[in-house]
C-alpha cells in the first residue's frame, strides 16, 4: 500500500477545488484523497489492485465510498465528473526490483498511460481527470497519448522538490 507523501498531498490540494455529482479515484492507496472527495461529491468510488489498500480504506474512509478491487477503472461503466489518480511514475527497467507502488514502467509513464486510457471510458463528456506526473517521467509519451486520443492536458500545479518536480495535470476531452 502506498503511504501518503508529497505527491498525495499535492493531488489532494488540487482535487479539493473540484465539486460535482460523482468522483472516482484510481489507486486509492491510504485513502487520503478519497476522504477529501467525499466532502465535494455525492457519489464517490475508488479502485486499487492492492486488496490490502482497499481493506485499509474500508476501516478509515467515510462510508460514502464504493470500493472495487480492479485494474484502473475497468469495474465501472459510469460517467464520472472527476477522476483522480496518483499513478506510480518513477522509471524502472529492472522487473526484479520493481515496486508497483512507485515504479511506472521503463519510462515512468506506462502505468499512467494505461490509467488514462481506462479512465476516459468512465469519464463524463464534460468531466475532468487529475493525474500526478514527475519530471523523472517521460512526459512526451503522455503528450503523444493526448494527441492520439484527442485529449487536452493542462498543468494545474507544480511542486519543486530536491530531486524532482511533481505536477498535477487536468485532462479533458477536446
Residue map of PLM features:
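Short amphipathic alpha-helical segments
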Residues: 58-59, 95-98, 142-144
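Mobile active-site "lid"/loop adjacent to the S-adenosyl-L-methionine
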Residues: 87-114
Amino acid at each position: 500500500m502506498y503511504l501518503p507523501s508529497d505527491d498525495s498531498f499535492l493531488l489532494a490540494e488540487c482535487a479539493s477545488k473540484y465539486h460535482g455529482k460523482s468522483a472516482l479515484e484510481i489507486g486509492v492507496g491510504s485513502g487520503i484523497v478519497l476522504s477529501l472527495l467525499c466532502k465535494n461529491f455525492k457519489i464517490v468510488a475508488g479502485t486499487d489492485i492492492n486488496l490490502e489498500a482497499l481493506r485499509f480504506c474500508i476501516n478509515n474512509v467515510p462510508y460514502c465510498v464504493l470500493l472495487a478491487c480492479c485494474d484502473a477503472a475497468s469495474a465501472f461503466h459510469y460517467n464520472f465528473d472527476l477522476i483522480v489518480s496518483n499513478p506510480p511514475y518513477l522509471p524502472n527497467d529492472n522487473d526484479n526490483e520493481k515496486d508497483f507502488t512507485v515504479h511506472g514502467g521503463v519510462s515512468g509513464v506506462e502505468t499512467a498511460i494505461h490509467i488514462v486510457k481506462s479512465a476516459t471510458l468512465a469519464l463524463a463528456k464534460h468531466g475532468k481527470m487529475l493525474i500526478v506526473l514527475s519530471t523523472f517521467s517521460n512526459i512526451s509519451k503522455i503528450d503523444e497519448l493526448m494527441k492520439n486520443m484527442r485529449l487536452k492536458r493542462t498543468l494545474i500545479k507544480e511542486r519543486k522538490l530536491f530531486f524532482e518536480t511533481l505536477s498535477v495535470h487536468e485532462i479533458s476531452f477536446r
